[in-house]
UniProtKB/Swiss-Prot annotation:
The keyword Membrane does not apply. This is Geranylgeranyl transferase type-1 subunit beta. Signal peptide: none annotated. It comes from Saccharomyces cerevisiae (strain ATCC 204508 / S288c) (Baker's yeast). Optimum pH is 7.5. The lineage of its organism: Eukaryota, Fungi, Dikarya, Ascomycota, Saccharomycotina.
Length: 376
């Protein structure tokens, strides 16, 4: 892993490994509310350990049988007895006569099994067609966007769930893992043109993507990653790409140059944020947005490292939000480490080193191996 060039900071690799390992062991009762999010906890932990060069397939491969139990096949009560499948976040959510699988837990589980190198599962066990049919049913026919789950009574896309760029990314990533590569592959299961139309409708006037014409770093990364998986980045105009790059570069907070004069004028300016990235304009820096912004820049231009100050963001992560006592990364320098920010902080550092695939959010070496071994 990378090391800050200025100052004594370095990555406390052993403590980060222990931090992620703790989340795969017995968690305290305060985490009971997250029981339905077990697949997310496993993904963030396995991803973090993989970034820090832990052989997770050797260390946790014995638990693949337990992981596989979360894969549920359901026969819908329709005229065609349609079979769909996906993952539940926890076995307590495997409720008879109710469709409780959802897109996020399905993607978290699939990515975790890729990192655990359970290639036998993808090649011989996973019913990719029924899984793709579930993704298809989550698409809103009127907008082209996706919801995360089905109505447990009607088995149509949930009418109360939100639909946004996050779920569009998750849906396309699942189909990509299932073997979809060309537009024709995706068209077999979803209305790709309508999806592309929805993504384009989320473009903001000053660059980037977001709802209600307010650009957001996380949504921008989701939109660009979705377009990349669909091989459709060329649909963006050169002007929009340039505007988006400019907007993303302006999200890197600096205590140098003109920005230092904001200290008394901007309530959202904090000098200690120097080098970090904010998710929106007039917000404080946040560890996770370092990844979302850097991944977006990486997808837009091969010169991204020359445009942004990677040394400063590295120093920000290592000096400000890395927890040298407990391991992990926090949202900012005032809070404790949490699993989400620890994973994305580690991913940002790995992305700078060229060791992380931002499109699927897994280490590059694992992505390469999966692509080679599982050619559907």
């Amino acid at each position: 892993m990378c090391q800050a060039t200025n100052g004594p900071s370095r990555v406390v690799t052993k403590k980060h490994r222990k931090f992620f390992e703790r989340h795969l062991q017995l968690l305290p009762s305060s985490h009971q509310g997250h029981d339905v999010n077990r697949m997310a906890i496993i993904f963030y932990s396995i991803s973090g350990l993989s970034i820090f060069d832990v052989n997770v397939s050797a260390k946790y491969g014995d638990h693949l049988g337990w992981m596989r139990k979360h894969y549920i096949k359901t026969v819908l009560d329709d005229t065609e007895n349609t079979v769909i499948s996906g993952f539940v976040g926890s076995l307590v959510m495997n409720i008879p006569h109710a469709t409780t699988i959802n897109l996020p837990n399905t993607l978290f589980a699939l990515l975790s099994m890729i990192m655990l190198r359970d290639y036998e599962y993808f090649e011989t066990i996973l019913d990719k067609r029924s899984l793709a049919r579930f993704v298809s049913k989550c698409q809103r026919p009127d907008r082209g966007s996706f919801v995360s789950c089905l109505d447990y009574k009607t088995n149509c896309g949930s009418s109360v769930d939100s639909d946004d760029l996050r779920f569009c990314y998750i849906a396309v990533a699942i189909l990509y893992i299932c073997g979809c590569r060309s537009k024709e592959d995706f068209d077999e299961y979803i209305d790709t043109e309508k999806l592309l139309g929805y993504i384009m409708s989320q473009q903001c006037y000053n660059g980037a993507f977001g709802a209600h014409n307010e650009p957001h770093s996380g949504y921008t990364s989701c939109a660009l990653s979705t377009l990349a998986l669909l091989s459709s980045l060329e649909k963006l105009s050169d002007k929009f790409k340039e505007d988006t790059i400019t907007w993303l570069l302006h999200r890197q907070v600096s205590s140098h140059g003109c920005m230092k004069f904001e200290s008394e004028l901007n309530a959202s300016y904090d000098q200690s944020d120097d080098g970090g990235f904010q998710g929106r304009e007039n917000k404080f820096a946040d560890t996770c947005y370092a990844f979302w912004c850097l991944n977006s820049l990486h997808l837009l231009t091969k010169d991204w490292k020359m445009l942004c100050q990677t040394e400063l963001v590295t120093n920000y992560l290592l000096d400000r939000t890395q927890k040298t006592l407990t391991g992990g990364f926090s949202k900012n320098d005032e809070e404790d480490a949490d699993l989400y920010h620890s994973c994305l902080g580690s991913a940002a550092l790995a992305l700078i080193e060229g060791k992380f695939n931002g499109e699927l959010c897994i280490p590059q070496e694992i992505f390469n191996d999966f692509s080679k071994r599982c050619c559907f």
